[in-house]
């Protein structure tokens, strides 16, 4: 139905002029009737856009429990009023300053994706009104964050962040459901500690790195010392064995001289220069 058509007809009649004579009263009445009819039709219809739902408030019976989907619907003018709700999920960021188990202050930013329970729209309007999310979400998010964060130390908020997020999500969904608000997603987007705590953590990390470096140097020195001891023990044992061999077997010295002479001769044979050596140079004079 074209809502502008009755007003267009009225405008055309005004341009042509009202009938004169005995038909003047009839023409005026028809014009008024058409205008009233068009106005009544226009005020008796309301539209519900996509992603929205509507309920009615009646001056006689109050809020009705019927929920109107998308499309055009009728209402009684001056008696009924349509109340529109956006039922699409809406994001909202809420910050909360709270304390940890070890009394460290931390600023947490929580992002929630919320929407109203369509079947509970009349109850939501009766108890909370149209700005239900503004009335409920900031308070319950702060309450849940404070209760969950107080169970963990500051360091655990970093190492166990997934567990913290899960507890916040579960508790927040339960609290929001009491107000007929559905949460499609809850996430901790930002966790910021105090400057003093951040500086203390950095100092602790530097100290741990220095301690690990010192431990490495100590271990390396200990290993080098152990290597020297083993080498000295080996050399001492070798000297002891050589002394015993010389004492018990006099020919051991001649054997070592022959081995030394062979090594010298082998080295000189590979040289480009020709060198004449006598037996004394090769330590062979004393060999019996």
Curated annotation (Swiss-Prot):
Gene: phb2
Mitochondrion is among the record's keywords: yes
Motif AIM, residue range(s) on this chain: 125-128
Gene Ontology cellular component annotations, sorted alphabetically: mitochondrial inner membrane; mitochondrion
GO MF: mitochondrion autophagosome adaptor activity
Descriptive protein name: Prohibitin-2
UniProt cross-references to InterPro entries, sorted A to Z: Band_7, Band_7/SPFH_dom_sf, Prohibitin
Alphabetical list of Pfam families matching this protein: Band_7 (PF01145)
Coiled coil: none
UniProt key word Membrane: yes
Subcellular location: Mitochondrion inner membrane
């Amino acid at each position: 139905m074209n809502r502008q058509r009755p007003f267009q007809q009225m405008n055309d009649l005004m341009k042509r002029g009202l009938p004169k004579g005995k038909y003047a009263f009839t023409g005026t009445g028809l014009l008024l009737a058409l205008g009233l009819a068009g106005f009544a039709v226009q005020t008796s219809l309301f539209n519900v856009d996509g992603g929205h739902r509507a309920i009615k408030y009646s001056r006689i019976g109050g809020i009705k429990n019927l929920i109107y989907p998308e499309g055009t619907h009728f209402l009684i003018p001056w008696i009924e009023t349509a109340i529109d709700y956006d039922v699409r999920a809406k994001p909202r960021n809420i910050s909360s300053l709270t304390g940890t188990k070890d009394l460290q202050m931390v600023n947490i930013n929580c992002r929630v994706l919320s929407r109203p329970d369509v079947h509970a729209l009349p109850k939501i309007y009766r108890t909370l009104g149209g700005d239900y999310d503004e009335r409920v979400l900031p308070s319950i998010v702060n309450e849940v964050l404070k209760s969950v964060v107080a169970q963990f130390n500051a360091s655990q908020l970093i190492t166990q962040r997934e567990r913290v997020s899960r507890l916040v999500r579960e508790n927040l969904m339960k609290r929001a459901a009491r107000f007929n608000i559905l949460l499609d997603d809850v996430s901790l987007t930002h966790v910021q500690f105090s400057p003093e705590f951040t500086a203390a953590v950095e100092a602790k990390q530097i100290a741990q790195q220095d301690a690990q470096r010192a431990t490495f140097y100590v271990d390396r020195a200990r290993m080098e010392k152990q290597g020297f001891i083993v080498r000295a023990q080996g050399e001492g044992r070798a000297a002891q064995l050589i002394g015993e061999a010389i004492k018990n077997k006099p020919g051991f010295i001649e054997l070592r001289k022959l081995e030394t002479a062979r090594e010298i001769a082998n080295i000189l044979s590979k040289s480009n220069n020709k060198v004449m050596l006598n037996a004394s140079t090769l330590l062979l004079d004393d060999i019996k």
